């Protein structure tokens, strides 16, 4: 009989119960007992949902108070030694110190989980780290599920992936050298799970989809031989997010009882495993765990029916990956219309899709006729819908020419035209875009959205805020101003609500990290701009000052990356449609007299594919759609972009090919070390390295910012340097913002005084230098 299961389930709750319980506990408004009660209730509800849908196991081990990688580290005793915590006695409060930091300890580093929008806490490996024993939370949850009558399958992050995701610290030369010490801790966990009556452990090794160095792939055989000898439950090796076919021979050889493959992202990979090993279960990931569209059940059944005939009971069906990455339950959704809702499936609905496939496989198509027909009708409705397909948008995208993705002149020519228009001083000062959003601003936006505030009153309040922001910037002495973005709740949602082809849920929340949840927009159809989105705000702001005002837009790749994207056309095509909508906005801003336009791309690097062989294609189209959005303007209109990453080296050629006149980047926390890559690459255009960290309420001393600017001037010619904070200032308070910016302007004045003979890029004295630099 075919088995159905899920690799994981969202932990936050359909109404974000975990988020609110965590934040209440952190504020001291509730007790640890209250928090634990919420966790217990959520686990019970989620296990019951799996049972009620007909899954053969409930998955235990996917719940975490903050992050599953942190919880794995705690289980294995692999906590950073700098905290001095005893893993076996770890309290919830201590676990939150690891995750969030406190006055005595910086938090653990956090980074993206593969190519998703979830963030995990990075384990720290030091020479003095000793593994196991750790917390007993996992075993408590196993007993909790068993006591409720559930058949348990445990999900556990595998040892090689755990080490691969970690960072070496404290002089540790080789993370992999710790594997022999780590394996006994895993073996002990597996033995204890067997003693608790657990039959199967899903051991996640998503690192197997990556291009691993030989030493890392070679580590799998001995590691799993050790685990197989531990006398634990049967192991289901889980891979996801990409094909593992390049490691097919290795995976076939491992002493595990089953393997999970992502057949949504990489359906073709099954061929590399043919014939399927006779000693292994195949867990076929045929329901998309990362997107919200209904599964084409007819198509999925056509894929799994032959597998069922060949494998019989050795065929399991599952989502492609954990359902952590999709909202909990479509039944809780109130904002979407019935047609659009009918095209979607959240986590709870995806469990039902698995049950339909199981019924059709075991009892035949007729037994699942109604559900299959409903799926087919939804797929057909979406394919034929006029709200999805817009011929004029498709024709415009198809007509894009190479010259539409190129500025009219090279950077040195543009720099001269822009400087003639803008007359900027050496080391121009600016900010990244947003300014503090007070409770009054947020309240006005919310009242306007609910219809409680008339349009004219709302306009007056926003204009008053813009006028205040402009006046404050002028008083501080900034050189290029922004309007402050008071009208925007979110840099993607604001634009999505003004574009056709986008929809927004009321309750489509997913976990980003800890208690932070995001509600990604839904791109369901061809994207176009019915009318200008930002022009009137920027035009009004520019009317208040003689200084140049930057228009502020979110770039096409970021609009794509931070959304649930339609799956019926290539992502590149959707990105191009967004770029064309932004191109129209850019041209309208220019026509309104806006001389500088910033197109933010904080998610440009996040879109990188997991496999090295796919990276060049992505970078080519990602840079091209940016240029499409930016290239319809005159030479004297200055295009800015902003990015914030911890690593630039591998994408610098692509960033250069975006051909923005000015790029601002986040560098203060790295003490300007990130800027070194731009210097070594000889980045040809202008750069604004962030001189202070906006994520901290601390106001840096003038001397600190001056020292950072000095370091920057040693890497990038001072004529091409801008001065700015790391990121937008939306989440900060006005007193700290004004103090920090005042210090930033003073640090800039001091540096200008030491470079009195220099002038900003594009002025006649420096044109030759820039032409030479651009050709270097």
UniProtKB/Swiss-Prot annotation:
Pathway: Amino-acid biosynthesis; L-methionine biosynthesis via de novo pathway; L-methionine from L-homocysteine (MetE route): step 1/1. This is 5-methyltetrahydropteroyltriglutamate--homocysteine methyltransferase. The keyword Zinc applies. Keywords: Amino-acid biosynthesis, Metal-binding, Methionine biosynthesis, Methyltransferase, Plasmid, Repeat, Transferase, Zinc. Residues 755-776 are annotated as: Disordered. Pfam families: Meth_synt_1, Meth_synt_2. L-methionine binds at residues 432-434, 485, 600. It comes from Ralstonia nicotianae (strain ATCC BAA-1114 / GMI1000) (Ralstonia solanacearum).
